[in-house]
Amino acid sequence: MDRSPLFLIIMGAPGSGKGTQSKLLASQLSLLHISSGDLLRDAVSKDTPLSQEIKSYLDQGKLLPDTLVWKLVHEKLDEFQQDTLLRRLSFLSRSENSAILDGFPRTVTQAKLLHEFLSSYFPNYKVILLDISDEEVLNRLTSRYICPACQGIYNEQQGFSSCPKCSVELIRRSDDTLEVILDRIQTYKQETQPVLDYYTEKQKLITIDANAPTQQVFQSILDSLSASLVYQERDCCNCDCDDED
């Protein structure tokens, strides 16, 4: 696969495997894994003006406005972009000159803000959609267990009662109930479809069948990325963007 800097955004319904696939891709392609959920938890644990602003919304049970969530993500992206420039100037390898973003954007406004930023530094960024059926989401979420220590995810079929890595007893998430899961699926569809439409229009979307086993989904992503990047290279080589008048 092409070794030039790469930026990926991964999207999908609850239970589609975003976290798992993000980690696999980060390891395989030397990507920095940026999770908006991790950024939020980290921000709340600190005492900064931004964290205080976030806490004020959370304490009132209010949703964070798009601009505030973007400020949090942009802070990390700006830090990452500056590090990337330093690596390029130092003629270092691509290792972590590229990244995968998980959990953001969730609205069209957020998508537009992110697109404006990425267009300047990673114009060929791609959005991976893990497309999964409602039935498979229900099957996965109603049978999953989580390690409270390392956040590892396991399912009933694996037969673990404790985490094989931490030896900590596995637990069920309190919101992994049928009623809550159905509500989360519906909310996801309502919120995400406009974002998917936006990325489809921008020709950034790569749709992957996520109903398959983990490794099969992972290979499908790699194959699709390779095909997409090769096509982009050929398209660029055939254009006259570098031709003089």
UniProtKB/Swiss-Prot annotation:
Zn(2+) binds at residues 147, 150, 163, 166. It catalyses: AMP + ATP = 2 ADP. GO terms for biological process: AMP salvage; nucleoside diphosphate metabolic process; nucleoside monophosphate metabolic process. It comes from the Bacteria. GO terms for cellular component: cytoplasm; cytosol. ATP binds at residues 15-20, 144, 153-154, 212. Residues 35-64 are annotated as: NMP. Residues 143-176 are annotated as: LID. GO terms for molecular function: adenylate kinase activity; ATP binding; metal ion binding; nucleoside diphosphate kinase activity. AMP binds at residues 36, 41, 62-64, 103-106, 110, 173, 184. It is found in: Cytoplasm. Its main location: cytoplasm. It holds the Pfam family ADK. Keywords: ATP-binding, Cytoplasm, Kinase, Metal-binding, Nucleotide biosynthesis, Nucleotide-binding, Transferase, Zinc. PROSITE patterns: ADENYLATE_KINASE. Gene3D superfamilies: P-loop containing nucleotide triphosphate hydrolases. Pathway: Purine metabolism; AMP biosynthesis via salvage pathway; AMP from ADP: step 1/1. Catalyzes the reversible transfer of the terminal phosphate group between ATP and AMP. Plays an important role in cellular energy homeostasis and in adenine nucleotide metabolism. Consists of three domains, a large central CORE domain and two small peripheral domains, NMPbind and LID, which undergo movements during catalysis. The LID domain closes over the site of phosphoryl transfer upon ATP binding. Assembling and dissambling the active center during each catalytic cycle provides an effective means to prevent ATP hydrolysis. Some bacteria have evolved a zinc-coordinating structure that stabilizes the LID domain. Monomer. Belongs to the adenylate kinase family. This is Adenylate kinase. It comes from Chlamydia trachomatis serovar D (strain ATCC VR-885 / DSM 19411 / UW-3/Cx).
